[in-house]
Amino acid sequence: MLINLSAVWAAFALSGVLAPPTWPASIDELEDLMFLNTGYHARGFSAGVTPCSFSQQGPSRVASAEWVRTAFHDMATGNSFTGVGGLDASIVFELGGKGGENIGAGFNTTLETYTPFFSTRSSMADLIALGVYTAVRSCGGPVVQVRTGRIDATARGPIGVPQPENSQGTFINQFTRMGFNVSDMIAVTACGHTMGGVHASNFPQIVVPGSAPNDFQLFDSTVSFDEKVAVDFVGGVAGNPLTSTTAKRSQRDADMKVFTADRNVTIKALADQVTFRSTCARVLQKMIEVVPSGVNLTAPIAPYEVKPGRLQLSLASNGSTIAFTGEIRVRTTSRPVTSISKVELVYKDRTGGSSCGSCIITTEYKGTAEGFDDSFAFYGFEARFPVETAISKFNVRVVLNTGETVVYNNNDEEDDNRLIISQKVRKNANTGSVKLSVTTKTPRSCCVTPALTTQSVPMSPQTTVGPYTLYAGNLTLAAAYRSNAKFDVSLTSGGAVISDSFKNTADLSSTCAPFGSNDPTMPDYTFDGCYTDTPESRALTSAAFVKENMTIAACSSLCKGYQFFGLEYGTECYCGDTRSNSSMQAPKSECNQPCGGDSSETCGAGYRIAIYKDDKWVPITSPQIPGYNYTGCYSDSPSNRTLSGSFTYNEKMTVELCASFCNGTKYFGVEYFSECYCGANMFPGSTIQPESDCGFFFSANKTQHCGGSNRINIYTKLDM
């Protein structure tokens, strides 16, 4: 595997509470997960608890409550006096058998939901903490500040999770061990029990089977995060299963014991909305900050005002130039995107000078993303520099429609407050040793979550291109890991380590070629014609991309795996296996707009798309699953799932793997790259859709389709 060695780095430090962070920082991955819920580059961490009452597991489950409960159970065995235990993801190892102190399927489900986001930069313990913020905000609750830096346990922790049959004195002693006084014990219990409820299958002495819908009794009558649980208790309103006469008979009326521990003083105060929200924000943050001694938490995560992303330095033009690509994310919470005229990078060359002239890199608008409380706009760029001058640092300049200019300098009071970008490895430099490290998620038999396994190999110099030396390293990966592993390239010299880290193996080419090869290659596609196209009825609907430097070859690469690709308006690229019947052929002369990246080529025009066909395309067929027929592409939605039985998410998902997971159910279906659903019945409102709507590929298998956005491929069991 040939690795382009480029390191983009900067020193970082977190300052006071909620101060603007300095990029890059240890929080960067979790900051994205926390704030990019929907839209462009959305991470989707909040999808599992959106809306508040939602659960992939069906109507008797509330994922938001399960996320909060998982954090409490993980933390609850901690000892604030000895510094042992706390929120350290030891719960991963504590779910064997019947669950012990952790009864119910919600813990495994929660950990499985977090697994796709688990990485070297987002520990499982930090994800559990982030889950509390996400679940509470999704349900309309207050902001629970999240500090990061938790270290995952490697074995089960001590016992000591509070159980409903405990006495009031035992509860007080257990919470004292955790670091909570009596008032905070009452508050954190009420804040945790404002969502969710009790399952009869888990606690039949508390909820008698058959006595509640779906054998699931809620703590109060609302699904949102509110003070209702406290209001009901103070007002004597029945409903909370942990204060009921049924629970009292078996001495499992846990909320009654806890709420009355200070003669109702705290629970009465919590019946006030303002008090409830402010108190819950405080005690839930306190809960997720019970950590083992030796763990140093960062300042609370705050959103960047301006955040660079996807930065890459690459040799180009046979080593005569350096290409610099990336994106700038601008926070638009208090400054709408419509007020921004342009975003620019103002840079210095290698020596810190301005021999580049104006030294400005322009950007183009890419899209917007939203979180619970913030919004963001993304601006992409691509620039090239002579290798002799290159680039060393830059500021970000935001120009508003009013003419006002705001310059962001990364909080660096020294060196003109600019981001620092390292040089490439020059052949006259003392390079020291270069190493390639690849991290994969390795399944383990003990737990539902994988382990992170890192393999490292030395890289050796291969050739020189201009003033640079190229290095290569070879490391074998199983096919299942090739599309979702992370890799780092590090240079150690004179005791200092510079690394280009947390890169996706999915971004690498599937084949290696000598750098600067000029061997002619024949394209694998032919021109299919010029066609009409409109935003309301696209000719190709499976995928879409916009690049300012678009070319025919670039669009072909972006649409690899699809039968057709098409170019429009100079910079737009569309993909699909079928062409819409609403798109009519037009004269070739009407597809006359030059491509943004090569003016000698044409890339469609306004409402005209130049379509090409992949000559080596192999039709994607639904695999034959013994005992099942492929039924078709159906509509689906998070609020009314087509199949509402079991669910699993797996980055290695295939049709065969989903069939195995569903284990003989009448229906199973695949959707949205990696999702698998099972069910005995189909939702009546789900309707058959065009096959082109189910044009997504599996994340790790480009030979099978995996539904689409709100579209699911359904397989039906044969009548025997």
UniProtKB/Swiss-Prot annotation:
Leader peptide range in chain numbering: 1-24
Pfam families attached to this UniProt entry: peroxidase (PF00141), WSC (PF01822)
Entry GO MF terms: heme binding; peroxidase activity
Keywords annotated in UniProt: Glycoprotein, Repeat, Secreted, Signal
Keyword Glycoprotein annotated: yes
UniProt-listed GO biological process terms: response to oxidative stress
PANTHER family named among the record's database cross-references: WSCD FAMILY MEMBER CG9164 (PTHR45964:SF5)
Protein name in the entry: WSC domain-containing protein ARB_07870
